[in-house]
Curated annotation (Swiss-Prot):
Keywords: Allosteric enzyme, Carbohydrate metabolism, Disulfide bond, Hydrolase. Homohexamer; trimer of disulfide-linked dimers. Pfam families: Glucosamine_iso. Gene3D superfamilies: 3.40.50.1360. The record marks S151, R158, K160, T161, Y254 as: Part of the allosteric site. It comes from Escherichia coli (strain K12). The active site is at D72 (proton acceptor), D141 (for ring-opening step), H143 (proton acceptor), E148 (for ring-opening step). Disulfide bonds seem not to be essential for the stability of the oligomer under physiological conditions. This is Glucosamine-6-phosphate deaminase. Pathway: Amino-sugar metabolism; N-acetylneuraminate degradation; D-fructose 6-phosphate from N-acetylneuraminate: step 5/5.
Amino acid sequence: MRLIPLTTAEQVGKWAARHIVNRINAFKPTADRPFVLGLPTGGTPMTTYKALVEMHKAGQVSFKHVVTFNMDEYVGLPKEHPESYYSFMHRNFFDHVDIPAENINLLNGNAPDIDAECRQYEEKIRSYGKIHLFMGGVGNDGHIAFNEPASSLASRTRIKTLTHDTRVANSRFFDNDVNQVPKYALTVGVGTLLDAEEVMILVLGSQKALALQAAVEGCVNHMWTISCLQLHPKAIMVCDEPSTMELKVKTLRYFNELEAENIKGL
């Protein structure tokens, strides 16, 4: 596992965006051989999406031959609702870059057959071979996507019940009213995530410090979903300074020394 220790959320966004752009450009995608990118929603990736849009407008990257799969979507929330993940992604990213509509894949939380929707999502991912890079965030309790604590580390795309803590955390997007936050969501599984060629998790804020500690210094444990990254051959954690407050000094020093060349210029 790589840990990229930075100072601010803006630096995390810029580093992550630069990494994505470098991966896409090195891949040299074509219509017949697209780069497949997994994407999250929420507050954490906002600085990354902003940086990606800026890099696209500066001519540094094209998304014309990029295929995206989003991590999750609320169940029962209309697609046009401002807080649906469909709306979030278009508002913050898709509408500002040159990605074709047919290359965008989002789970349908209003599908008449939820099980079939989840199964078809997995099949479509497999039809591309694999996701080349899956970017995500992490919850205070260590969840990735909506894989809440005690999720199977072999799980696939499915419907999940959201914990009260997750709904409270997400209520900031719903007028701070937890009753407006859906109780269920569709989410890729931990196994789906681990199948990706590379996984990059962004970690921001002191409230994520215990989750980061569990991921880096703890044991693999289904109560801390984030710890599954220890099983992945190519995992990256990109974090700001407040999120590292629970790490041992020697752990942080170790990764600072390892990544010194990769965090220059931010």
